[in-house]
Amino acid sequence: MDMVTLGSTGITVNKNGFGALPIQRISQEDAVYLARKAYRAGIRFFDTARAYTDSEVKLGEAFDGIRTEVYIATKTAAQNAEDFWKDLHTSLTNLRTDYIDLYQFHNPAFCPKPGDGSGLYEAMQEAKAKGMIRHIGITNHRLAVAHEAIDSGLYETLQFPFSYISGEQELELVNKCKGANMGFIAMKGLSGGLITNSAAAYAFEAQYDGVLPIWGVQREKELDEFLSYIDNPPRMTGEIKAVIDHDRTELCGEFCRGCGYCMPCPAGIEINNCARMSLLLRRSPSAEHLSPEGQAKMKKIEGCLHCNQCKAKCPYGLDTPALLARNYEDYKRVLAGEVKV
C-alpha cells in the first residue's frame, strides 16, 4: 500500500483520495454507498467544497458516527470574511461535524494574506484558533497564485491540477511544495476525463512521494478501479510509459481541461464539455455526445455572443471562443459522416 503524508499537516493516508465533486450528480443513496464503500476499503481522505451543491450533505450522512476515522477537506470561494463564516458554518452543518480537517480557499484570483484587506486569512486563523478547522490550504489553477502561496509560508497544502500530461511548470510546483514541507493534492489526475487509463495515471502520481491524488468518483466501477490499486499499486512499466508517451503526443498543445471556471456562459453554452468535444468524441464513448441532447448542447455554440468572458476567466489562458468554433466544426463533420471517430 502506497502512503503519503501531506507536509506539515501530519495527515498520513493511502495514495488514493476521494474527489467528491461528481457525487453531486447522483442520488443521496448512491453517493452515501460509494463513500462508505471507499472508507471500508481503506480510503481515508475525502475532498469536497461548498460550491459542489449537495456533495457535503452526502458525505455528512456517509460518515455520521465515524467522523474521527476519516479526513475531510472542503473549500470556500468566499471573497470576504462575512461570506467565509457563512460558508464555514454551512459546511460544518452539512458535514455533521464540529471541525474540518483541511479548509481550503477555493481557486481565488489572488493569494489571501493577513492585512490584504479581504479579511479572509484572518478569518482562517480565527477559525483554526477556535478548533473549527485544523489545517489551512489553498486550491488553484493559476501558476502565479500557486507560487505565491508556497512562498508565503501561510499554507499547509496546495491543491493544483497534476497529471501525466502536465508540463515542467506543474512539476516545479510539486518539487517546490516538497521543499517547503507543504502537502500537494493533485486534482485532475485524469485531466477531466481525457486520460482513460487509470493505472497509468496512478503509476505516474505514485512516483512523487509527497503527492496525494484525488480521483473524482461517480460510478462504482470507477471506484473499484482505484480500490484495486490500494493493495496492488501500478508501477511505471515500459507498457505504461508507452501509454503515457502516446497520450502526451496526442494531448499536447492547447486543449480545454474542463475545469468549468469559465462557467456560467451568458449564451448557455456548456463550455467545459463543448470546448473539448473533439477529444471527448475520440477518447470516450461517442454515442452520448452525438445524441439529440448532445447535438442541442453543441448547437448553442452558434449563439456565442463573443463577449470573451470565458477567455478572460480561463486559468490556462486559452482562446476559448476559438476553441469552441474549432470543436463545433469538427463535431458537424463527425455528424455528417465526413470524419470517423
Whereabouts are the PLM-identified features?
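Generic structural signal for well-ordered alpha-helices
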Residues: M3, A35, E56, G60, ...
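Structured C-terminal cap/extension of enzyme domains
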Residues: I43-R44, E172-A186, L190-V341
